UniProtKB/Swiss-Prot annotation:
Lineage of producing organism: Eukaryota, Metazoa, Chordata, Craniata, Vertebrata
Species assigned in the record: Homo sapiens
Family indicated by similarity: Belongs to the NAC-beta family.
Domain NAC-A/B, first and last residues per copy: 82-147
Localization in the cell: Cytoplasm; Nucleus
Name of the protein this chain belongs to: Transcription factor BTF3
Residues where Phosphothreonine is found: 160
Protein encoded by which gene: BTF3
Length: 206
């Protein structure tokens, strides 16, 4: 037997020719396109998907309020008075304060006419730093409650308070019951006689 078909030959354009095998005389062979372009795009698509997932997670973390979000717990720091005192004492040591003994009381006068009174306080001072500290139990009292022992502590700034006090004293004496200056008591008062008892006795005798 004799072969009638001829092997296919490919030209420079990628088309093949066959002689005698097809009734038309020529046959073209098509080759699949190269896949290099699609392989390079797959990693880029994966990166974009991963970036979108990361962005969605970040948005969920940053979002405040709304349905489905977890409640944020507010951190409350409880500070005690002892901790504040320790910090204060540490700061005072840096300033080099010294204790002043023999202080029985400290009175601080306010513009409202009241007195902040400390009884037997702990007083510390640093003249170089121009710092004075008073530690103890403080009581807010009226200026009238501290009289007359506080008179020798009043300065020029307390003249207005003294004037107010002098104006308030007459009002208090008028509103309240003032004691009698003559020393007479209400129990010793004798009622006035209205009827004549001598005439009544004569009528009974007749």
């Amino acid at each position: 037997m004799r072969r009638t078909g001829a092997p296919a030959q490919a030209d420079s354009r990628g088309r093949g020719r066959a002689r005698g095998g097809c009734p038309g005389g020529e046959a073209t062979l098509s080759q699949p396109p190269p896949r290099g372009g699609t392989r390079g795009q797959e990693p880029q698509m994966k990166e974009t998907i991963m970036n979108q997932e990361k962005l969605a997670k970040l948005q969920a973390q940053v979002r405040i309020g709304g349905k489905g979000t977890a409640r944020r717990k507010k951190k409350v720091v409880h500070r005690t008075a002892t901790a504040d005192d320790k910090k204060l004492q540490f700061s005072l040591k840096k300033l080099g304060v010294n204790n002043i003994s023999g202080i029985e009381e400290v009175n601080m006068f306010t513009n409202q006419g009241t007195v902040i009174h400390f009884n037997n306080p702990k007083v510390q001072a640093s003249l170089a730093a121009n710092t004075f500290t008073i530690t103890g139990h403080a009581e807010t009292k009226q200026l009238t409650e501290m009289l007359p022992s506080i008179l020798n502590q009043l300065g020029a700034d307390s003249l207005t308070s003294l004037r107010r006090l002098a104006e308030a004293l007459p009002k208090q004496s008028v509103d309240g019951k003032a004691p009698l200056a003559t020393g007479e008591d209400d129990d010793d008062e004798v009622p006035d006689l209205v009827e004549n008892f001598d005439e009544a006795s004569k009528n009974e005798a007749n």
